Amino acid sequence: MTVSINEVSKYFWKQTGTVQVLENINFQLEKGDFVTVIGPSGCGKSTLLKIVAGLDNDFEGEIIIDGERITKPSKKQGFIFQEHRLFPWLTVEENIAADLSLKDKYVKDKVKEWVEIVRLDGFEKSYPKEISGGMSQRVAIARALLRDPSVLLLDEPFGALDAFTRSHLQEVLLNIWEQKKTTMIFVTHDIDEAIYLSNRIVIMSAKPGEIHKVIENNLSYPRNKTSQSFQQLRTKVLQQFEHGGLIQTSI
């Protein structure tokens, strides 16, 4: 078992009272699983991801990664935000290396490997202002995976990109997953994206966020969004929103 999320609940305290954001979340991921999480806005998807990342330790329950209880960020978790969050004063290769020294041959070789995997050859010495948003997000992906984390956490990483760039980065991510078999949890509002990428789809209900349904995705790779089997699964997911009363909030 790579990741175990056990009885996780989360509350926020405001002047008007206590607000429960997550309620008794339980699910497990084996090594190499690719799970997408979808649900109404405000259901706690991003909050759950931050808890798994160790960025929020004020919650009930526990997160176990590779047998270790998680209370803070570590090399076990890689995190990719919607914004690339690159350092503007560092080059592409320096951003990928982050706090590691490129003078170290092992680090330099690892950075070179990831530059090739995310198809940024020739842009190693470029600065963030000199590359596109899609390329910047590829740098963020490489940076998050450089240390070989047990799980990669992605919080709507392609949400701000145009359709063409988004589609391209989906292929880049799938290529990485197929090569490395990194366990991934990917939050998205896009049902097609959820189906296209993952082998399991976690549907969350509105606040307080609970797991409404987990749907196994057995479509073979590479997937065709226009195929009958893809559309049938899409209908199945949509029915969960409609019949489960989740459609009241935008997804």
Curated annotation (Swiss-Prot):
Highest taxon of the lineage: Bacteria
Function of the protein: Part of the ABC transporter complex SsuABC involved in aliphatic sulfonates import. Responsible for energy coupling to the transport system.
Catalyzed chemical reaction(s): ATP + H2O + aliphatic sulfonate-[sulfonate-binding protein]Side 1 = ADP + phosphate + aliphatic sulfonateSide 2 + [sulfonate-binding protein]Side 1
GO cellular component, one term: plasma membrane
Domain ABC transporter: 3-231
UniProt keywords, alphabetically: ATP-binding, Cell membrane, Membrane, Nucleotide-binding, Translocase, Transport
Keyword Cytoplasm carried by entry: no
Quaternary context: The complex is composed of two ATP-binding proteins (SsuB), two transmembrane proteins (SsuC) and a solute-binding protein (SsuA).
Pfam family, one: ABC_tran
Topological category with respect to the lipid bilayer: Peripheral membrane protein
Name of protein: Aliphatic sulfonates import ATP-binding protein SsuB
Compartments, record wording: Cell membrane
EC assignment: 7.6.2.14
GO molecular-function terms, A-Z: ATP binding; ATP hydrolysis activity
Uppermost EC category: translocase
InterPro entries referenced in this protein's UniProt entry, alphabetically: AAA+_ATPase, ABC_transporter-like_ATP-bd, ABC_transporter-like_CS, ABC_transporter_ATP-bind, P-loop_NTPase
Organism listed in the record: Bacillus anthracis
Keyword Transport appears in the UniProt entry: yes
